């Protein structure tokens, strides 16, 4: 399972090979076996079969839990990856060993079933009596009847063949007619869909054109209005800037008026250009470097 698996801590004792238990002569097991005639260093089993007897020390496993016998098998199954057999089956198909893998899967399934429902079939022999003789007589009569039936069936089979052929031909004709009708209906549907699509496209194009024309008209009107406003403002500024002589006041000299006009004209021109720039969005965007 890797790092995601359950970590099992194993603590090794002072005697990991369990030699202290086997060498201890004070325990009940050692005393009981010595009473039965066993001596230290001898093997287990009958004296006449010492060649087949066990000569190694007996190793035991202490049961320190309350789980029943065979519970370790279930624990071993949990460690296996889910769907591993399916993955092996897929690999076997890719490698050209599909039959071997299927046979292995079938064997494993049978093992599981045998483990759950263990059964051994024992044959109990066959019953013998009058039933077998009756079946033999009945079989001979059935053979005679079958011979007579076969002759009749041969005569009827020719008519059946002809009727089958005619029915097959009729079915084939019906299928071909049905296919033609389906094809015609499909073509009509395609044509209707195409015409609808063309109409929709034409409508969309017309709407786009109308929108474009409206937009252009609106822009032209706005430009015209701006121009008219601009002209009106310029005329108004000119009127306001021109000096109005009052009655009873002395007229300025020609040299002073010419100088005044030159200064005022430059100032008025600057103010006019500034106002025009503020009113025009395009020029403002150019000044502030803003893209439309």
Swiss-Prot record:
One GO biological process term: rRNA processing
One Pfam family recorded for the sequence: G-patch
Limits of the G-patch domain: 25-74
Major location (coarse): nucleus
Single GO term (MF): nucleic acid binding
Compositionally biased tracts (Acidic residues): 142-158
The keyword S-adenosyl-L-methionine appears for this protein: no
Subcellular location: Nucleus, Nucleolus
Entries under InterPro entries matching the protein: G_patch_dom, PINX1
Composition bias type Basic residues, residue spans: 163-179, 192-236
GO cellular component terms listed in the entry, alphabetical order: nucleolus
The keyword Nucleus appears for this protein: yes
PANTHER family documented for this protein: G PATCH DOMAIN CONTAINING PROTEIN, PROTEIN PXR1
Family assignment from sequence similarity: Belongs to the PINX1 family.
Protein name: Protein PXR1
Organism this protein belongs to: Yarrowia lipolytica (strain CLIB 122 / E 150)
């Amino acid at each position: 399972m890797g790092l995601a698996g359950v970590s099992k801590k194993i603590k090794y004792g002072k005697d990991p090979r369990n030699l202290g238990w086997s060498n201890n002569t004070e325990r009940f097991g050692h005393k009981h076996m010595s009473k039965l005639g066993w001596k230290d260093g001898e093997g287990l089993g009958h004296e006449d079969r010492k060649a087949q007897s066990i000569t190694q020390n007996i190793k035991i496993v202490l049961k320190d839990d309350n789980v029943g016998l065979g519970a370790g098998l279930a624990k071993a199954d949990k460690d296996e990856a889910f769907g591993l057999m399916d993955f092996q089956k897929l690999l076997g198909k890719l490698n050209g060993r599909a039959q071997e893998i299927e046979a292995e899967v079938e064997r494993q399934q049978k093992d599981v079933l045998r483990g759950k429902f263990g059964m051994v079939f024992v044959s109990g022999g066959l019953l013998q009596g009058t039933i077998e003789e009756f079946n033999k007589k009945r079989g001979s009569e059935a053979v005679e009847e079958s011979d007579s039936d076969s002759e009749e069936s041969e005569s009827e089979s020719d008519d059946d063949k002809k009727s089958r052929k005619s029915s097959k031909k009729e079915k084939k004709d019906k299928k071909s007619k049905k296919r033609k009708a389906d094809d015609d209906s499909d073509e009509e549907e395609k044509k209707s869909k195409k015409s609808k699509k063309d109409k929709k496209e034409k409508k969309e194009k017309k709407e786009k054109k109308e929108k474009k024309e409206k937009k252009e008209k609106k822009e032209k009107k706005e430009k015209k209005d701006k121009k008219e406003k601009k002209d009106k403002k310029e005329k108004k500024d000119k009127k306001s800037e021109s000096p109005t002589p009052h009655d009873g006041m002395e007229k300025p000299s020609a040299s002073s008026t010419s100088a005044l006009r030159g200064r005022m004209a430059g100032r008025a021109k600057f103010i006019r250009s500034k106002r025009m720039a503020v009113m025009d969005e395009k020029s403002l965007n150019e000044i502030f470097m803003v893209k439309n």
